[in-house]
Amino acid sequence: MPESSQGPSVSSQLPEFNAAPGDFVGVDRCRSCHKEEVIEFQKTTHSKLTFPGKDYIQGCETCHGPGKAHSDAVQAAHGDDAAIAEALKKYPMFSFRSTAEENAARCLTCHTSSKQQDFFAHSEHAGHGISCNQCHATHLVDEVKDQSKGDLSYPQGYFFQLPKLADETRWLHNSLLKQSEPDVCFGCHRTLQAEFALPVHHRVPEGLMKCTDCHNPHGTLNTANLRKPGWETCVNCHVEKRGPYIYEHPAVKVEGCVTCHNPHGSTNRMLLVRREGRQLCLQCHTGFHTQAQVPHSRLGYQTSGECVRCHVAIHGSNFDPDYLR
């Protein structure tokens, strides 16, 4: 949960929360009709949130708004279905089945830290009408089984062990995701799911990486909601390619790693977008090159030749402007 929603109270900016304290009835009144929902809800962090008034209001009404008029009208119907339906229509509570914009506005009233509120309205998800509750559940996903925190560190000398991640039910609960990653993402991103099924892929399906390691689903100022711009996302893990180099390869720094690599999956080695590496080079290097006035054809630049036979430092070099070493 964001820092602003972890304290003893959360002040809301929504107009209805300017209602008089007497307009709020408390969770016990909600339970009289919505027993299962309240039992589920009270296991979550959301159930502990409050906002200030004459008395601190806590529970369902923190998100759904004051419930007195709604509750009184339903009770006055005395079990008559038609009267209840009319009461619900006349005195509705906020429903997260509303529009994506209304749902997001409700959540972002509290979730304002880490630039979430600033960027989400301009994110690709928001632009496509994706609301918070399509990925997150406002009530409980699963009860926490393991209170210990995950340990992502490796013991000294062990470089190929799988990281010990937090118990799945713990981080599902903490972020209230309806499904674990990557399943929650694959629900919409079917094409990317197919790419991750290709023989060479980043280890997202195996659980060694998450989509959110590279992307921020709540929005950033970068293409594809990347956490860092361009190649910086990649070198966050591939540190040996970071540089800086005296002789930078413009394809890396200007266009980025995706010029040559498909980060999600490929049928080619090293996630290359082309089967033969030389085909990648020829996308940019279209002219007739010579080295010391000797045509490349005499140096093995033929159908079966690979540029990296000689240009071994293709990501950048501190020694040679032609990336020969």
Where do the model's predicted regions map?
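Short sequence/structural segments immediately N-terminal
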Residues: 1-325
